[in-house]
Amino acid sequence: MLTHKTCQARKKMQVSFVIRDAEEKQHRNGVNALQLDSNNGKLYSAGRDAIIRVWNTRTESNDKYIQSMEHHNDWVNDIVLCCNGRNLISASCDTTVKVWNAHKGFCMSTLRTHRDYVQALAYAKDREQVASAGLDKAIFLWDVNTLTALTASNNTVTTSSLTGSKDSIYSLAMNPSGTVIVSGSTENILRIWDPRTCMRSMKLRGHTENVRCLVVSPDGNQVVSGSSDGTIKVWNLGQQRCIQTIHVHKEGVWSLLMSENFQYIISGSRDRNIIVTEMRNPSNKMLVCEEKAPVLSLGYNIDKTGVWATTWNSDIRCWKLPMYDRCTLSSGGMDAQWTMGGTELACIKGGAAIKECTVLNDKRYIITKDSQDQVVVYDVLRVIKKEELGPVDYEEEVKKRNKQVYIPNWFTVDLKTGMPTIVLGQEEVDCFAAWVSIEAGLPECDDPTTEIKINYGKLLLEALLEYWTPPHSMPPNEMEPDVRGNGYFQVPKHTPVIFSEVGGRTVCRLLVRDAAGDSESTLLHETAPQWVTDVVIERNIPKFLKIPFFLQPHPQMTKPERTKKDRLVANEFIQCRKVCEHVLEKVLNAETTPSGGNANNSLQNSQSDANSEGSQLPAEERIELWCNDVIVDPNMDLRTVRHFIWKQSTDLTFQYKTKQNFNFDGK
C-alpha cells in the first residue's frame, strides 16, 4: 500500500507560462479521449492542449461549447466519468491524476503518485474504483469515494499498487464489477490482475507490438485488444489464450469500442479508418468512415446511432453507424466495400495548432506558423499576441523581421500543446541573461539622458507574480510605497503560470490573477525557487554579464608609434559609442595629457566629454572602430559585435582610428 501526500522534495525548478486567449473554446491540438454523459448529453473531450472541454451534444447549434476544465499543463491522455456523472478523473503527461467536479468544472484534488506520463485509466462502475497506469510501469487503484472527499487539510489518500509490469503501460481496462483488470504495454503482452487481491493471475502473448487499446467483457471472461501491429485479438481468459485474430486495418489499432452485446467491434486506426466488424465472423465488416488523420478515440453518441471520433487533428466528428444486420460484404468483395462511406452527423470544430516557431534575434518576439498556415507574431515579454499576419511566407517574415542584434537566449519555447509555452529557468538557458537598453519599446524614463538597462527575465517574473504577497511578509512602511510588478507593464491576468521540476513533475499551477489568494500565496511560498524570490520579493538585481576585449590603434593611425594593446572589461550590452568615448577621453588624452586616465579602467564609469564646451561632435563621429576589417556601427553593443563580426572564441579585439579632420588635440 502506498500513501499519497502533497508535499514535495525541493528540486531544481523552472517557471513556464502559456500565451493564449482568456477563453480557449476550441481544442488547439489532437484529442486523446472522450466520455459521454448519457443522462444530459454532455460530451467531455481530453485535449493535447492540456484542456478538458465540455460540449452539449443535444443542441443543433454549431456552438456546442459549455465550459473548459483547466488545471493540467501537458497532454490529457485519458478521462473517465464516475459517480453517475458527478465527477471526472483525468490522466496527463504532466504525471498527475486529477479529480474534478464534472458539473462545475473545477479541479478538486491532484494525485502525484506516478513518476512519469500517466497514459491510461480504467473504471469499475459497480465498485466506484479507478485504476491509473503509465510510462513508469506502475498501476495504482483508487477508491473514487475517497478521492472525491479529499480537502486541503485532508489530502492524504491510500492506494493499492499492482506490480509486475516490465515496460511502459499504454492501455488499461476493467469490467464494471471490478473483478478483472488488464494492462497492455510495450512488452507486447497483456497482463491480467484480480484487483480485489492485487494479485496477477496471468499474462497473454500474441501481439508483436505495443498493445494500445483494451476492452473487457462485462462478465470478465473475454478481452479484446488492439495493437500497433495492426491486429485486433479476442482473448478467452478462462482458456488463457487468443481465440480470434482480426485483420481489418493496414496500420496500428489505437481505439476500440464494443456493442452492448459484445458481438461487434468498432475500431479506429492509424490508417485513419473506422471499421465495424462482427466478432464471430470477421469477414462481416463495414467501413464507417475514413477520417482525415489517425484515429485516437471513439465513443457512442447519446442514442448509439453514431460514433464520436477524435484524431491527431483538433476536430471532433460524429459518424452515422451502419445497421448491424446490414453489415455484409457486397458481391464485389473487399475492394467494393471500401467505397462505402459514412455520413457525418455532427462536427465540433477545433482550432489550429502551432507547428513552427522562430525566436527573433531581439529575443523578445517569436514568429509562429500553425496547422492552417497562419503566421502570428507574439510578444514574449508582454505575454500577448502582437500581430496576425495571415497565410504569408513564413521564412520571408522571419528574414524581414530579424535584426542584426545579438541578445542571449533567456527563454525556450515548447509547442507540445499547440499553444506557445514559454519556459524560464536557470539551467541550460539563464532567464536573467538578457540585459537590454530602455529603447526596447518600454516607457521612457523621466531623464532621457540617463541610460537605463533592463533585464527581460526580471521584468517578466515581476509581472507574472505581481499579485503575490508572501505570507508573514512585513507590512509596507508608510514612508515607502508597496512596490508591485515591474513599473513598466502588466501581463494578462488569465495567463497560466506553472512551477515544475526541471524535466519532471508539475508542482504548482495558477493564473496570474490568483496569486493574491491565501492558498495560492502559501503554495508559492513553499514552491517558488530562490532565484524567483530573489528578484520578485527581495527585489535583487541580476548580475551583469561582462565581456573582456582588447583595444589597439589601427595601422592607419597618424601616430603609428603607439602600439600598446589595452585589455578592458565591460558589460556586454555596452554600445560601441561608449568605446569611442573611452578612446577619445582616456586613450588619446592619455597620450597628450600627462594626467590622462588609465586605459585599463572598466568602461562602466567612463563619461564622455564629447559634447562639452569646445567639442562640436560626439565621440562616434570623431573616432572610428574597426573589428575584423569591418567598420563597427556605434549603435551595436559588444555582444552583437562579438557574435556577428568577430565570430571567434578568443577575446574580442577592436582597432580605433581618428576620422578625417580630427587631430589628437580634439580640435
Curated annotation (Swiss-Prot):
Naturally occurring in which organism (per UniProt): Drosophila virilis (Fruit fly)
Keyword entries, A-Z: Repeat, Ubl conjugation pathway, WD repeat
GO biological process: double-strand break repair via homologous recombination
Function statement: Regulatory component of the Usp12-46 deubiquitylase complex. activates deubiquitination by increasing the catalytic turnover without increasing the affinity of deubiquitinating enzymes for the substrate. The complex deubiquitylates the wg/wingless-signaling receptor arr/arrow, which stabilizes the receptor and increases its concentration at the cell surface; this enhances the sensitivity of cells to wg/wingless-signal stimulation.
Protein name in UniProt: WD repeat-containing protein 48 homolog
Recorded family membership: Belongs to the WD repeat WDR48 family.
WD repeat spans: 26-65, 71-110, 113-152, 164-203, 206-245, 248-287, 290-329, 349-388
One annotated GO molecular function: ubiquitin binding
Quaternary structure, from the entry: Catalytic component of the Usp12-46 deubiquitylase complex consisting of Usp12-46, Wdr20 and Uaf1; regulatory subunit that, together wtih Wdr20, stabilizes Usp12-46. The Usp12-46 deubiquitylase complex associates with arr/arrow; the interaction leads to deubiquitination and stabilization of arr/arrow.
InterPro entries (UniProt xref): G-protein_beta_WD-40_rep, WD40/YVTN_repeat-like_dom_sf, WD40_repeat_CS, WD40_repeat_dom_sf, WD40_rpt, WDR48, WDR48/Bun107
Keyword Zinc appears in the UniProt entry: no
Keyword Repeat among record annotations: yes
Region (Disordered): 591-615
Domain of life: Eukaryota
